């Protein structure tokens, strides 16, 4: 899996395609940590091309959502695919970590 980064000043967008399994969750975590260390104030995780996410992937999203929020910064999921949106809805996290709480929301 290749995560595509778009960086504009201190705003990062990470486009995550395919299935987010344990290995992909580790890769996502490394990319989020790199963004934080680089001074990102906003990190948007674009899941429009993601098909599925495991519990380790959800843990990464929640852990760094909380860390960023505590320091007055932002980490949000944007444009989740229907499958990802359904998983986040079932886990109760959709309204917490998804921008606008809906799939297909553009920044």
Spans of model-derived segments:
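STAS-like cytosolic regulatory interaction modules
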Residues: 1-52, 63-107
